[in-house]
């Protein structure tokens, strides 16, 4: 069994059947319990996620109904071969009883964490394999088919940061392995999606310069300077300005 949240939300049963989880408050509740696996999530937190500051008078009863529907859905589809209960009641709320390998988020976190450790140990190929495996679990934006309240929105932000962290580690591993050229398309994509991340801009500038594409590296700097000026009214960091001068002077650039 595997719950997959990193993209369109679905569950793969022990029998190998793929069960899409419909966009509903019951799915919203289940996803929050999965992300806080082995932790009792209070009814108040669940009500906040589902209705924010405007819960109905029947919120507690309706919450119990959603839990019932969730359990029935998982039971009807025989998600587990042993029919074990996955959503348990424990005051003051509920919790999801699943193993780490039964949730793609947990697997991704472990693989990226392992990749970072291997990178620190200079085991570059092993680090890259672990990071690739972790990042490949993303099939699109996390929780893309689930309505999200403010509690889940914070979880989405965490998952986006985790993905970015893993991608930066992978860039570092490839850089240290001398595989600079193939990183440029990914870096270009990253600076578009994270335009205020100066570290990514610096990596792109350095990669372009290393590949002999000095004009493009300088254009990348001008683009960063314009974005920072327009959005924040500041200049690039002194380190990036120094890199810019090194590129202008044809000196060796260190990133």
Curated annotation (Swiss-Prot):
GO biological process terms held by the UniProt record: antibiotic biosynthetic process; phosphorelay signal transduction system; regulation of DNA-templated transcription
DNA-binding region listed in the record: 1-98
Molecular function terms from GO: DNA binding
SUPFAM superfamilies membership: C-terminal effector domain of the bipartite response regulators, TPR-like
Superkingdom of origin: Bacteria
Regions that span the bilayer: none
UniProt KW keywords: Activator, Antibiotic biosynthesis, DNA-binding, Transcription, Transcription regulation, Two-component regulatory system
CDD domains in the cross-refs: BTAD
Task of the protein: Transcriptional activator of actinorhodin biosynthetic genes.
Family statement drawn from the similarity comment of this UniProt entry: Belongs to the AfsR/DnrI/RedD regulatory family.
Protein's recorded name: Probable actinorhodin operon activatory protein
Organism (species): Streptomyces coelicolor (strain ATCC BAA-471 / A3(2) / M145)
């Amino acid at each position: 069994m595997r719950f997959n949240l990193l993209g369109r939300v679905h569950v793969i049963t022990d029998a190998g059947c793929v069960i899409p989880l419909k966009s509903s408050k019951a799915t919203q509740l289940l996803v929050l319990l999965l992300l806080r696996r082995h932790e009792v999530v209070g009814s108040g937190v669940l009500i906040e996620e589902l209705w924010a500051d405007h819960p109905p008078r029947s919120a507690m009863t309706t919450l119990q109904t959603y839990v019932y529907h969730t359990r029935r859905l998982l039971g009807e589809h025989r998600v587990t071969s042993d029919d074990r209960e996955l959503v348990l009641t424990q005051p003051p709320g509920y919790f999801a009883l699943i193993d780490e390998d039964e949730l793609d988020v947990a697997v991704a976190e472990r693989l990226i964490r392992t990749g970072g450790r291997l990178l620190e140990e200079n085991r570059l190929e092993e680090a890259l394999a672990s990071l690739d495996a972790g990042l490949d679990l993303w099939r699109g934006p996390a929780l893309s088919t689930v309505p999200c309240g403010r509690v889940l929105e914070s979880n989405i932000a965490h998952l986006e940061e985790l993905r970015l962290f893993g991608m930066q580690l992978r860039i570092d591993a490839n850089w240290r392995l001398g595989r600079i050229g193939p990183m440029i398309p990914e870096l270009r994509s990253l600076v578009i999606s994270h335009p205020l991340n100066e570290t990514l801009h610096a990596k792109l500038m350095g990669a372009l310069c290393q590949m002999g594409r000095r004009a493009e590296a300088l254009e990348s700097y001008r683009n960063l300077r314009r974005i920072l000026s327009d959005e924040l009214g500041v200049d690039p960091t002194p380190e990036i300005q120094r890199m810019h001068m090194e590129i202008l002077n044809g000196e060796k650039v260190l990133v």
